[in-house]
Amino acid sequence: MKVFSVVGITQSGKTSTVESIIGELKRRRYSVGSVKDIHFEAFAIDTPGSNTYRHRQAGASLVTARGLQETDILYPLRLPMKKILEFYDQDWVVLEGVRDINAPKIVCAHDEEGIEALLDASVMAIAGKVANTGLKEYKGLPVFNPLTQAAALTDYVLAKVPPLLPDFDRQCCGLCGMSCQELLAAIIRGEKEPEDCLLRQNVELHIGGKPVTMVPFVQEVLAKTLTALVSTLEGYEPGKEISLVWQPRKLKE
């Protein structure tokens, strides 16, 4: 899965940029998902007095509204992006307004001051209404008009965005010699490749069908523990793949 975010202030052209890229990706036969981050504090799809609202008021911790055209699962909290992305299996997920993720970003702005306010090492391009000023480049970053340059912008996205990287601190992993955020910035600059991420999952753990990313130390502990348990069993062969599926049962009190 490849993920990137389009960020910017209100009315700077974010949604138009997202629409243009999604449309181009679909025309090129990619599957696409999207996430819209809403910063309006009072925002809620559920409304007081609705049946689903009454379910929640009665004590339901998770409520689902199932209609003929769509199904909405209403979580009563703001989910982290890592959790949200677990629901997606598309080739691409385009985020709008999301900043708290280790992924490349496109900044939309009205002017250069607006660009500068959001500029950091994760930014790979500029787009939105600032393109109407005639600006073609800003500090080495290309500027795209999403309405007239949708194909060129999508070409750039396809060339620049790596598969979603981990998001660990240097102290937690650091196998590549830098933090995950620093590695992303180096990939955007063309100094590193996605393959330079040395966090290889030779031990895979799934909980509830969802993969769990583990740092090398945890992988090693799990591998050594499992190997110690099964190495005494008949049929064990060093170097052969070991698969374990565990369906926990509630213990009797």
Locate the predicted segments by residue:
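Conserved beta-strand/loop subsegment of P-loop NTPase cores
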Residues: V35, W92-E96, P104-H110, I115-F144
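N-terminal phosphate/diphosphate-binding loop that engages ATP/GTP or pyrophosphate donors
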Residues: S20-P76
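Local cysteine-cluster metal-coordination motifs and their immediate loop/turn environment
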Residues: D169-A185, L198-L199
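The conserved Walker
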Residues: T10
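Glycine-rich phosphate-binding loop used to anchor ATP phosphates in small-molecule kinases
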Residues: E70-E113
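Immediate flanking context of iron-sulfur cluster ligation sites
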Residues: K160-C172
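Hydrophobic anchor at the beta1->P-loop junction of P-loop NTPases
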Residues: V6
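Conserved glycine(s) of the Walker
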Residues: G13
